Amino acid sequence: MKIKKPDNSHNSLDSSTFRENWTSRDGKIVILRSIASNDKRIEKELIDGLSIQSSRYRFFHVIKEATEEMVSKFCDIDYKNEIAIIAEYNSNGKKRNVGVVRLFIDSGLQTGEFAILVADNFQDSGLGTKFMETLIDMGRKRGLKSIYGEVLADNNKLLTLAKELGFSVGTSSYGEARITLQL
């Protein structure tokens, strides 16, 4: 998903302290929580470990290795204007980021653009659905009127999930669809 960062300076509902336990369909315990600056290592590992297809679906091109600048941008966020929730999984004593969902808020328009990424080995676990339900709830609590995302037209998993959650699907540009949910 492509994201354009809006320039906002209002609406201060704090999402920076979100934390919730969640269990995947196959019984894995995952902690959903607000991303923090000290998550750079696990965010980089998530991005660097993506399959070509997952990288393309999230970034609209393949990223073989996340740069320090990119990871900093993703982890050092302003919760007045953004929401970023990661899925932390403890695998054999090692903390791993297995997904992230983001919402960039345009308070003036009362809307937000989202992006979602689920690690390949956590796809089809229910995490994408949980992420989107959480983001929708947070958007409503922020008083947003809608959320939307740009999706590659061949990203059938996300398009199917969006339809199941009530998003409308429209055409954006060549090879892309825009999915929108009125809140």
Regions found by a protein language model. Name each.
Residues 1-183:
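Long, contiguous binding/interaction regions
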